[in-house]
């Protein structure tokens, strides 16, 4: 299995369990699912036998259910919800992207990434930024669990069918970790 970590924060944000599609040489998109989850639900280890353990049946949460994206749930991403005043304004996000691009470029150079790959990032990023900013109002914005303000924001929108959510991430802002 391959886990993709944000090169700025080190947060795990994606894995090859998702069908990943490269877009314009600089972005990754992957389809997600939304489902109901009990709020504050404890994580159950696969193979664990909860009926053999002591405790009440409602130990996993307070009974209230919330909608979550699978990518959000699996990687403990934090949803910056508009109604809670946490989603950055378009101008603030644009400023973040400008700083983020510089940090990614510096990381790529620091890691000794081939010049051709760095050039591909420099060439493709401006068009991707323009595309993202044009669609910004439609995105749900999520951050890694560390809440590092300099790190990548994971963007979630819906496909043309209006039903299938998909996440958008910066290809060059991720590093692979085989587990």
UniProtKB/Swiss-Prot annotation:
Q: Where is it predominantly found?
A: cytoplasm
| Annotated TCTP domain residues | 1-179
A Gene Ontology molecular function term for this protein is: calcium ion binding
> Where, subcellularly, is it found?
Cytoplasm, Cytoskeleton
Q: Which GO terms describe its biological process?
A: translation
Q: Which PROSITE patterns match?
A: TCTP_1, TCTP_3
InterPro entries for the chain: Mss4-like_sf, Mss4/transl-control_tumour, TCTP, Translation_control_tumour_CS, Translational_control_tumour_p
- A GO CC term? cytoplasm
Entry-linked Pfam families? TCTP
Gene3D superfamilies xrefs: Metal Binding Protein, Guanine Nucleotide Exchange Factor, Chain A
Which keywords are on file for this protein? Answer: Cytoplasm, Cytoskeleton, Microtubule, Protein biosynthesis
Q: What is the purpose of this protein?
A: Involved in protein synthesis. Involved in microtubule stabilization.
Q: Which family does it belong to?
A: Belongs to the TCTP family.
**PANTHER family on file:** TRANSLATIONALLY CONTROLLED TUMOR PROTEIN-RELATED, TRANSLATIONALLY-CONTROLLED TUMOR PROTEIN
Protein name in the entry: Translationally-controlled tumor protein homolog
Q: Which species is the source of this protein?
A: Aspergillus fumigatus (strain ATCC MYA-4609 / CBS 101355 / FGSC A1100 / Af293)
Phylogenetic placement of the source organism: Eukaryota, Fungi, Dikarya, Ascomycota, Pezizomycotina
